[in-house]
Amino acid sequence: TDYVDLLLLRAGAGNTSSAWRVLQRLYREGLAAAIGICDHLGEFGTENLAKIAQGSEVKPAVYQTRSRSYLRSFATHGKVTDHDVQVQLLYEPGEELKEPALAQISEKYGKTRSQIILRWLVQHGVCAVVNSASKERLLENIDIFGFELAREDAAQVEKLWRS
């Protein structure tokens, strides 16, 4: 193929405005099917994303961030989707897996704690990206589509990020 599926501008990498103009040109020339912002350190923020989304000919299709910065401020999700930008989250399991409430929900559904988190993300419109070197873990990660979290269980999971 002679194009990339998704080309991301790494936030904090120099002059964002001029770099974004270059990405728009590459998109218009058909060299990138989609363009977006990669904000792994959480330093770009939704305010800057809003400026680009509102002031550009080509809006970002994706806002990619890491789980720690995103999940600690879940309100970001609404701000991003207000601009029709897909959130892509690099999910890295952490301390939340030790939470007793998550263990109870996990047991209720017969799923792992990570599967409960991933299912919650998907139910909230987030494109979750996970990493694994093991076949078993990869299969576990994709086994999240055969169930849906009940509203009260989803609310319990959301509380993990608020604390």
What are the residue ranges of the model-derived segments?
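An active-site-proximal structural segment forming one wall of the substrate-binding cleft
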Residues: 1-3
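Beta/alpha (TIM)-barrel catalytic core signal, keyed to glycine-rich beta->alpha loops juxtaposed to Asp/Glu
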Residues: 5, 9-163
